[in-house]
Amino acid sequence: MASEDLNIVAESKKGEENVIVDNSKDMNRPENLDLSTEKTDTANENGPKDEASKLVKEADLPESGTSVKSKTAKDNKPVKRKSGTFSRSPRFMSQSSSFPTKGAYTDITRKSIDATTSKTSLKPVVAGGSKPKATPSSSSGVSAKRTSLVSAPLKKQTMPVKTISKDAASGPTSKLGDEGSKSIKEETAGKDVEEAGSTTAVVADKVSNPLKAEMASKDDEDTRSTTTSTSTPRGRRSSVGSASGFSFRLEERAEKRKEFYMKLEEKIHAKEVEKTNLQAKSKESQEEEIKRLRKSLTFKAGPMPSFYKEPPPKVELKKIPTTRPKSPKLGRRKSSSDATGGEAAPRVTKPKDSSSSTVKKPITKSQPKLETQEKSVKAKEKKKKVKKEEAEKRGEEEKATAVAAKPEEQKPNSNNIQVKAEIMASEVVVGG
């Protein structure tokens, strides 16, 4: 058993070395693939039908990625074999050819994508889903097979197939023809645009050239006419005459303009003078009218009517100065009998209400004020006494005259005297 295990390990090591050698060989394949892609490009130029056949072949191939993976999984399992020499099996060949190293694989995919990008859009597909069989072309040869092997693992990157109508399914050649016609139309359109630009430039040159020629011819004619007119004596005379006539007309027109402007200035000045005169007259007339109105407004007063009488003159009334009666102080009150000298003199009695009201009022005045009030009260009492004495004297004089004139009518006169004395006493009390 131990010897068999050693043989199996040795065989597996040899197999790994063979795989590495095969991978190293595959590393040198991209150069050959590049040549093959160039050949395929030349083959594409020969005709679009070969491209369609190649694409159909690539579609018919089975997915090599999945099959190879299954094969490698089987190879990785330990296989028990009897003792013997290790022979190179086709499994290892398929593995080495389909799975090169990573760097080479990435480069191959890029180159294969570059080689097959123009092919993906040219897949002819029938509406029913059946794929047309294409005859293999003899011109492509082995290079087409190599490109198909490289592009086989890239089947997943191809564009998804869309269902096409029955009219489009009549043949793939119609699509190819349409695309060719489109490319031809685009090329012709570009050429037409270039030709149109060149023609417009030529037309512009042609249009500008005759204009320049006409301008040059006009300048030549002008120079010729001036030289002929100045060279000949008749031309000189005519030019001198025309210049003199033209200058004479200019002078006449200038004189007429001056006269016209002078007349306009005179008219304007006259209008301004008239305006000033009218304004002055209007001011004078306004002043005169105002004076007339003032004179017309003045009128003479007519005589007063007979029934109108002036009111009598008002009599000026002498106002008696108002004085406040001040109540005398209690305890210092003098009797009225002391003031009056006799029975004939009327007694002055003050109302009780005023005395009672004065008694009820409390005394809250200070001493200096009381002294001043006492002095004023004494002065007033003296004045009253003097007046009463004068009244009594007058009454006595009247009595004497009355007795001398009419001794019989003494009684009524005495009554009248008493009434007058009472009136005078009341006046004295109010006035004092």
From Swiss-Prot:
Listed Basic and acidic residues bias regions? 11-60, 176-194, 215-224, 270-291, 387-411
Which GO BP terms sit in this record? microtubule cytoskeleton organization; protein localization to membrane
**Family indicated by similarity:** Belongs to the TPX2 family.
* Main location group: cytoplasm
Q: Which domain of life is it from?
A: Eukaryota
Disulfide bond residue pairs: none
**Tissue expr:** Expressed in seedlings.
Composition bias, Polar residues: 135-150, 354-370
Q: Fetch the InterPro entries from UniProt.
A: TPX2_C (IPR027329), WVD2/WDL1-4 (IPR044806)
Kindly list the places in or outside the cell where this protein is found, as annotated in its UniProt entry.
Cytoplasm, Cytoskeleton
* Residues with PTM N-acetylalanine: 2
Chain spans, region Disordered: 1-251, 270-416
A GO cellular component annotation here is: endoplasmic reticulum
Q: What does this protein do?
A: Microtubule-associated protein (MAP) that regulates the orientation of interphase cortical microtubules.
Please note every region of biased composition (Low complexity): 86-100, 225-248
Gene name of this polypeptide: WDL4
Q: In Gene Ontology terms, what is one molecular function of this protein?
A: microtubule binding
One Pfam family hit = TPX2
Q: What is this protein called?
A: Protein WVD2-like 4
Keyword list (alphabetical) reads: Acetylation, Cytoplasm, Cytoskeleton, Microtubule
